[in-house]
A protein has these predicted regions:
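Hydrophobic targeting/anchoring helices
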Residues: 1-129, 232-233, 245-249, 254-258, ...
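Short proline/glycine-enriched turn/loop motifs at strand-loop junctions of beta-rich domains
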Residues: 301-303, 310, 376-379, 386-392, ...
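A short, well-structured beta->alpha microelement
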Residues: 133-156
Length: 429
């Protein structure tokens, strides 16, 4: 959506929500949205915590009860670990796993068609948009969103092979957008139009039926721009070097009833494979690597109910105890956020790899490592520290500690009470 304009984007994920739910529900949704934002490698700027006092001091329900409490220690630790990792996240040219090159057209006017029911026509819960996207997404295809208002910019169509669109849930605010779409098809693109063009918004007074125009629907103008009749039926048509596929069904029907998306999905598969000569990869998960971080999500309602199993040497960043794992299983409906230790072992002498506090004043000596850890009061720091060997001495604010050592990962598991003024940690080996 923003790539053609070279705009800087900030992602926001919230550890709690405005709706009245419980802490467990907030945690589950936070993990999902946090993983989702990391699956866009072109973005590395984030708003991490809107209204911190609302998060740390607000009272919210305990799961399964009517009692309310402030944020649980376990959740604040996990949340702070997750947020701290964002300091290391950088943009990358790596792509999320799956078949790329399939997009769905959207426009600002999506926001205008929210009337729930009019003259017997409805589009419940944004179904026409989800009807175009979810049948692809749920089969592991990282469908792209293409903004109609960006079509005048040449980079908008970069890498795009198949573009799906419908005017059942949005309308073009300018006729000129059709010229850019038609030009893209003429040069070799494949456009899939889904829609019956019977919703009430087709008849609002707009450019396609005023000022000398007499189109019954804006799609008539688009089809005419591509050398077709104003109202072509179901079928496949050629225009220049490209292809136009017409499906006379509103995309809401693809998702309002189970199994109704089959014809639509088969149409997209055929269009993509005919255009590229490549097979579409169908799967139930997405995964991307960003530096030492591996982000994965396994979907429910997908092509398979199998879990995703990752083998290696990882720290589980969605677990407050930061366990070291050799196998991570992610079930349908779940996400995983892992630190890949194999990407740092032997490359870094000493470093706090992850933790629930911000690290300052790091000093690495021949046989020592020290730092200051800062984080909010009434929260617990848990961190994993990479060292060349098992330490002989660990001091936390001058007090000797005996934290857990993991030989396989060469990491020390530290835990102590956080302090915004700073906690001094000194390690010798």
């Amino acid at each position: 959506m923003t790539a053609p304009l070279n705009r800087k984007m900030y992602f926001l994920t919230d550890p709690i929500e405005d709706r009245a739910k419980d802490w467990l529900d907030y945690k589950i949704n936070y993990q999902a949205t946090f993983a989702a934002q990391l699956m866009y490698p072109m973005v590395d700027t984030y708003e991490v915590m809107p209204w911190p006092d609302r998060i740390y001091q607000g009272l919210y329900r305990i799961a399964g009860t009517d009692q309310k409490e402030r944020i649980p220690r376990s959740y604040s630790t996990q949340m702070q670990v997750m947020i701290n990792t964002l300091n290391d996240i950088r943009t990358s040219d790596k792509q999320i796993s799956g078949t790329h090159g399939i997009g769905v057209l959207m426009a600002n006017s999506l926001m205008f068609q929210r009337f729930p029911d009019h003259n017997g026509y409805d589009d419940p819960q944004f179904s026409s948009f989800y009807g175009q996207t979810l049948p692809l997404l749920k089969r592991g295809i990282p469908v792209e969103l293409v903004h109609m208002e960006n079509t005048p910019f040449k980079d908008t169509f970069n890498g795009l092979q198949v573009l799906v669109m419908s005017y059942s849930n949005m309308k073009p605010m300018k006729s000129e957008y059709h010229n850019y779409l038609a030009d893209w098809v003429k040069k070799g693109g494949t456009l899939v139009y889904c829609g019956e063009d019977v919703d009430p918004y087709q008849t609002v007074l707009e450019w396609w039926n005023t000022a000398g125009n007499a189109y019954k629907a804006p799609s008539e103008h688009l089809f005419e721009a591509m050398g077709l009749s104003r109202n072509p039926g179901d079928g496949t048509y050629r225009f220049g070097k490209g292809t136009v596929i017409v499906m006379r069904e509103d995309p809401k029907h693809f998702v309002l009833k189970g199994g109704n998306d089959r014809k639509y999905f088969e149409t997209i598969v055929s269009a993509y494979e005919s255009k590229t000569g490549k097979k579409i990869e169908i799967k139930n998960n997405f995964m991307v690597e960003r530096g030492p971080y591996t982000i994965a999500a396994v979907m429910d309602e997908s092509s398979s109910k199998e879990p995703l199993k990752l083998s290696g040497l990882y720290i589980d960043l969605f677990d407050k105890d930061l366990p070291v794992l050799t196998v991570k299983q992610i079930n349908p409906g779940e996400q995983g956020y892992l630190y890949d230790l194999n990407k740092v072992l032997g490359k870094v002498k000493a470093k706090v790899l992850c933790g629930a506090s911000r690290i300052y004043d790091e000093k690495v000596g021949k046989q020592s490592y020290s730092f200051v850890a800062k984080s909010p009061l009434h929260t617990t720091n848990v961190s994993r520290v990479l060292l060349p060997r098992k330490p002989g001495k660990v001091l936390v604010n001058g007090k000797a500690e005996q934290p857990e050592w993991d030989e396989s990962s060469k990491t020390l598991l530290l835990s102590f009470e956080n302090d915004p003024a700073g906690v001094n940690v000194s390690i010798e080996w």
